């Protein structure tokens, strides 16, 4: 009988003759194989004597006689890759495109080839095997082209005999049947056997949120079907995994670190998992553990502890309802968790927990006190491990000493581990070997000192080898073994003394096979076995789990025989039990409480016709159901599934009232501040949290949108609160001292921390700066040595939410984490503006570091002074001082800053300012102040190209206020639409100091062109306005709206991120904007194309339920009425919310505008106290049901597809497509519910035009719109792509143009590639890719178009009495059959013009032909290039013009980008 070979990596220490084999009959036989490299990937083919391992990354060794002899596999070198689902199958990945596969345990191998190089990364496997069909596999490869390497996925269904392409640019593909247990107990095999899930990038421009799609036909029909949950496409895919029969998806969304877990058992229907009783599941902070066929085990990491600690959850049989079992399980920094089930026995597992978890989490303990516990009832209870009268603690997964399982094997009930007795787990080197033969109930010490160990012959043989370091080295010359379950041990000398290390300077390594088959000649008989109960209760009787008792037939400990049943694992004997409470789990809509009972989770609803009165009772669900797969017998046992009588008061909601509900709460405060904690797509729960601060520094929290309030208990007043910029569940409260508070559970609880020093207000901003991707990383800027208003501001950083602080920099003005975005790839990168010499009176300079300024500091611009910096999207924008001017620089990688080229003769004085208007389309909007006199500020808005290096003028005279806010507002969701107010009397303002006069402007093509707002035809009463109204706004008659600079709360906006196309504003119709007191309220339903007046006078407004409810209330005067509309403003209804008039200071709702609740913040009469009204529209019958949206029939039910108009663009195209949005039909009586993906994937792409291109890097726009190389700059070597990618075949000569990254246009004008040339030494590949044209073909290609054009041109000339004139863009004339626009004339004219062009181009043509003979120049064909995604993608293709005639330059138009938020530099 053969046990597993023991791997010893070491050097031969005792010199002797060539080692021989021990020959004693009472000792095992040992054979040694010497190697010169460490053997890796040792694999045993099940049910065979074949063992295979890899030496380094090259040679592969194989043994077919259980390691007695070894040989090297000939002509097959590479990486060994095993098929874990099919134990006879494996692959060898060759170093090129040649690979091998076996299906018969390495007896035979078949060669196969993949067109591209396989991916061998830490996170990407080369093969993804089918769970049941060994012939099916997904193959992950990468294809390297001119623009870089891209992922390509292939598949095979016939054992690698044929390989076909599946997809490209995916982020991972998986078989639906990715585990042998998928579909267990369900008749779905035929439906999902060929189904493949793939993670793809976002389907829309700049939507990087990964989505999950599937196909049952290998995507051959180009149909990628999105996975949807309740009609919503699943996005933000973070992880895809198989846990036994369960398919599990983890998703994350912007604005929260919480992950949503979705589970399916049939690869067709998905449900979100709920976690009860512990911390929320966070992105990257959870691990799926070894699970059973009826539940999933998950470890969720704690967010607070600097020493890793987790919480262990166990699911019900659906995999969707998780209950926390252990709140302090031990884990390491890589999320490996000390958890392991005892092999083959249901319900028993060992864990290590942190006994001082609270002290560790709060920073009071510097190390973890780890103790071991065991559960015999599937995690309901845990008990200590007992050795005699002592507790023992064992090292587990986080400190592995064995390969494979840590404690157990298929040997029934045999468990071993290294540990110690006492009150806590000590270091491994201080441990002993312990063994249990009753599945962990009792333990005995097996051997002193730490040992590696292994099980053999179904547990009748235990083997151990010394594994404890003496100094830094482990010496051993013997092994130990036991034949009676570890009661007695014998030692066997090894041929030599070995040093157990991973590396050795002598480079000698050994594999030893140890054969114990000669120790017992007899094979075990019937009387040598016992019927062993796998689980015992407290009385020592066999215990039940999952409705049955489990027994094994195993060899008695003292039997002098071997089982000798090779390749056969023991199977349990099952004995059913009567049902008890433990055989039931919580039914859907219920959860476990602390007493392990099932209670409603808030979703319990009575049946139709029940609960007509609040005091009624009804027969409802018990909350329990029998666990699927449980074998218990209900007869004579417990049955918890029967319905029970329940009180109607238990129901989550009463009947729809048809009325609007109002709750009023008074507060003794004059001033107030409030913050909503917004919800993200993956946020769990349904709270609507508002946090409110009084002028006395008191904090009140409401979880139900202001219906009820709880007062926070803080020892000192709160001065400010700061919601986390990137995590919507987190908020910080700041006091006047070093003390501050945070909440990571949406205000449910608050925890105190101390900063190094109090924050100061000298910066004009709050002290905390957050990391975009690491929610617990903070920068705190406080003041030291403060004297009056003068402070030396110092920055500190923390990586654990303020538990510990380290010095970052002194003398700073601002510091911020950059995060990963675009080409910014370093998580640790920090930028700071620091005063020279740390002196607050001196100029600032820009510095950066990716080592927290502890080792390396980069000083940018040679230490020259800067005015400020900011980061927005993927750009870092800096304003430097250059004499009396400011200059702008931009970086996309945090290393190289490119000077931003402003339009000619556009200079910015030092005293003036930049305001950066944030962008979401890879460009920068910049407001440059041109006149800075207080109260008379205005400037110009510039727009950059996609790398922020070149600007064009977008809007002159844009209004700015003294706080540097700008009247510029991006209309949310709708692409390309923005509003702005301009000062039209700029000369009078500058020269005569007159008051500013404003006009409102709108753009529909992303600030390329602006127009006045068209006024409504009539006012709300049907009367005309006092000016001549036309379809377009004119200088004498247009609509003008008060903008961003006049708002009391800069969080207010004219539009909503969820109410598509709806805009509300306050203003007037006339020649210019008048005083706010004279304003009326206007609305647009089509993103600003048309407007109508909705109320006389000025009103405040809020959008609710994504625009299906809009509420307005009078501004600045007492009222007791609000008005609302349910049909996008077509009709309005007044509602009296109070008996006495109040003045509404503000109206608010959740920032996403998805709630049906609103808050009115009011003052009553002459009092200064505050009254907050909650207005709840949930009871309206018109909003009783949820709207239905079907993606395959988007206009069939409650929605329709709406496309915004872009009147200044041809065919409404913008960014290369016509956008389509899902909008609720105004008359649909339903509510939207969770936030919809408004932009439809059914967008229509347009042909490329000049608007889809911009100037390439090192090129700049000329006055005629063309692009030319910047004077003094040289293009980079376009052959760099060949150097960067050895597989590249060709490169393109630069044209000066590149496609906008945001554009999705197809075909049409192609300006970004003209001439292709072969890479060095790739002449043959280039010719194969671009076969040349024959001489005859060239003659025909030239002669026939010329002849045809001449004939048709002569006919047109003879039939048309007009004369050819000069063609200008934009001219229009009356149409006739012989007009220039008539097809009868336009086509011949085009042909004749083409003839003239061909004749003109003949010299260029012959020149080009000559060059093609010499240099293989290729004219553009049908090949299409991907849009540039980053600066690096186009940097390698710079250069001056080649083969581009001058007339083509005028095709390039203005760049198109968008921006929204503002940040002053």
UniProtKB/Swiss-Prot annotation:
SUPFAM superfamilies: Oligoxyloglucan reducing end-specific cellobiohydrolase
Domain of life: Eukaryota
A Gene Ontology term for the protein's cellular component: membrane
Glycoprotein keyword on record: yes
Record topology, Lumenal segments: 24-1336, 1405-1465
Pfam families: Sortilin-Vps10, Sortilin_C
Gene3D superfamilies: 2.10.70.80, 3.30.60.270, YVTN repeat-like/Quinoprotein amine dehydrogenase
Signal peptide: 1-23
BNR repeat ranges per the UniProt record: 374-383, 434-444, 481-491, 700-709, 1082-1092, 1124-1133
Glycan attachment residues as annotated in the record: 293, 882, 947
PANTHER family named among the record's database cross-references: SORTILIN RELATED (PTHR12106), SORTILIN-RELATED RECEPTOR (PTHR12106:SF27)
Name recorded for this polypeptide: Vacuolar protein sorting/targeting protein 10
UniProt organism field: Arthroderma otae (strain ATCC MYA-4605 / CBS 113480)
Upper classification of the organism: Eukaryota, Fungi, Dikarya, Ascomycota, Pezizomycotina
